[in-house]
Amino acid sequence: MLSGQPPDLAAFSESGLFSLYRAILRELKSRGVIRTENAPVGDYAEYLVATALGGRLAPNAEKAWDVLGNDGEKIQVKARVVSGPAEPGQLQLSPFRSFGFDAAVIVLLSAADYAVSRASKVPRHVVESTAVYRQHVNGSVLFARPEIMGHPEATDLTATLRAAQSGRENV
């Protein structure tokens, strides 16, 4: 049981909040309450991409894309928390269940504090031709391996997302 008052969360930076959240997730996992530590990753990555690219988040009902770029580009966002070096399985993204987007932005966040480790924008045709359909997940699976993240047609967005993340730290 928590004694006294809970900490003043408003006093924490965003990375400080994520570090605290990570510690909570680790404890819940050690107790068998949860099985993974990826809970807030997708929402946070979508938020960062929308902020960094000056876009807007898709309505919750939209299934094919997550962010509408300021140029009308439909972007699917996939994210994972990774340790350094990445452990087996950490690079497998959630399945693509449709390809109704123009590009996918793949975001890898540090397990320590959710800082952006790597981010790449990959054209849909590259994702579609590389992802492998898996019936048991009813979708196409892609791994955020170097050959995808550094694909000749991919755009490295690491610095752009880090700048958006850094700008949010001062809020």
Language model regions located:
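Nucleic-acid endonuclease domains
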Residues: 1-171
